[in-house]
Each structure stands twice: as C-alpha cells, then as structure tokens.
Regions:
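Conserved G1/Walker A P-loop phosphate-binding module
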Residues: 1-82, 193
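Canonical P-loop GTPase G-domain recognition
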Residues: 3-16, 145-200
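Switch II of P-loop NTPase G domains
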Residues: 18, 54-63, 76-106, 114-128
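Conserved amphipathic alpha-helical interaction elements at protein-protein interfaces in regulatory
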Residues: 45-49, 101, 131, 164, ...
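Glycine-rich, phosphate-binding/catalytic loops in enzymes
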Residues: 45-46, 88-91, 125-128, 154-157, ...
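Conserved nucleotide-binding/hydrolysis micro-motifs of P-loop NTPases
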Residues: 58, 70, 77-80, 115-117, ...
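Conserved C-terminal guanine-recognition region of P-loop GTPase G domains, centered on the G4
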Residues: 96-168
C-alpha cells in the first residue's frame, strides 16, 4: 500500500457510533498541536485530508479515514490546559471505549515533539499503552526544526526513554518536508501486511 486512496469518513464523539471494525486500524495519538493532522496528510500525500486545527484541545472526537485497505484513526489530542474536567473525562471514556472494544487494533502511532522531553501526559499515555499491551511505535514530529547534527542524538535519547514502555520503534518525521515519512510508511505497511496474514 502507498496510502494514496484516502477519504475522510466521519468524526465520532460517542464510541457506540464508531463504524464496524472490518479491516486493520492504524491509530494516531498525541498531545494537542503535536502535528497529528500534518503527519496524516503527509503519509497520504494530501494537503487537506486531516484538517489542521487552530484551536487545540477543542476536538473531542475520533476521526476515521478510509485509507486503501485499512482505517487511519485519529484519536483526540490530550494535554490542553484549558479543557474542562468534564471534557477530559469524556475524552478518557471515548479512548478507553475505543481500545477496549474488539476491534482490529493493528498499530498505534504515538506522536511526540522531538524538540522537547515527553510531558507528564505523554508519559502517562506511554504507560497506558504498555499496560494494555497496545502495539505502538513513536513518531517524533517536527524534525525539520532540528539541525542535521542533532537528529541521531535526538532519536537515541527518545529510544532510551520509550523502550521501557514497550515501544517497538522510534521514527523521526516531519509533516513539513517529509523527513522520515517513507520509513514510517514502511512500518505501517508491514503492520497491516502482518495483520492480513493472520486473518487468512
């Protein structure tokens, strides 16, 4: 797959309304404004498939995209300070319900900003994924903001941070210039292929 046949399906704020899980699902998680929409657009070679929000933390929905023979599942961003406790609880319920349902959870892409150490919310998410044995890789975003001399050291630092939480792989990426996108596409393709093999 090269992720070029991509369509937005719908946004879901209630877990019971999620579409039937009839194919592999690649989900994307991260802090508000970490660059999820930009990364999804770059993976699919589209500019406006996933809309980039100018109001972080306002989207308490799970967005589904039909991409070739799988789903891209954009989970709501977390860590926005101005969100009410009621909204936080609703987001927690939505995400818990998604992962607890018997769906084709093929692989999750956890996004982290490569310029900063993981926040408390990021580490909480890594612990959640590890505890629930959800297979995931980390995509470090905004690699275009680093100097070339910083790339290898940054990746190594994050590998050391994420490895104890069960992370399978760390990939440096940029939604701006496409850095690391082919590598991440290959990781996602391999995960979908393995899922399809098991289903046969």
């Amino acid at each position: 797959m090269i992720f070029n046949k991509a369509d937005f399906i719908a946004s879901y704020g209630i877990s019971s309304l999620l579409p039937e899980s009839d194919r592999p699902e690649l989900s994307f998680s991260g802090r508000s404004n970490v660059g999820k929409s930009s990364l999804i657009n770059k993976l699919c070679s589209r500019k406006n498939l996933a809309r980039v929000s100018s109001t972080p933390g306002k989207t308490a929905t799970i967005n589904f995209y039909s991409v070739d023979d799988c789903y891209f599942v954009d989970l709501p961003g977390y860590g926005y300070a101005k969100v009410s406790n009621a909204d936080r609880e609703r987001w927690d319920d939505l995400i818990n319900s998604y992962f607890e349902a018997p769906r084709h959870h093929t692989l999750l892409v956890q996004l982290l900003d490569c310029r900063h150490a993981p926040s408390a919310d990021d580490l909480q998410m890594l612990r959640y994924l590890h505890y629930h044995r959800i297979p995931y890789v980390v995509a470090l975003t905004k690699a275009d903001k680093l100097k070339k001399s910083q790339l290898a050291k940054t990746q190594e630092d994050f590998e050391n941070i994420c490895r104890p939480y069960g992370c399978q792989k760390v990939v440096l990426t940029s939604g701006e210039n496409g850095y690391g996108i082919p590598e991440l596409q290959a990781v996602l393709n391999a995960a979908v292929a393995a899922e399809n093999e098991e289903a046969e």
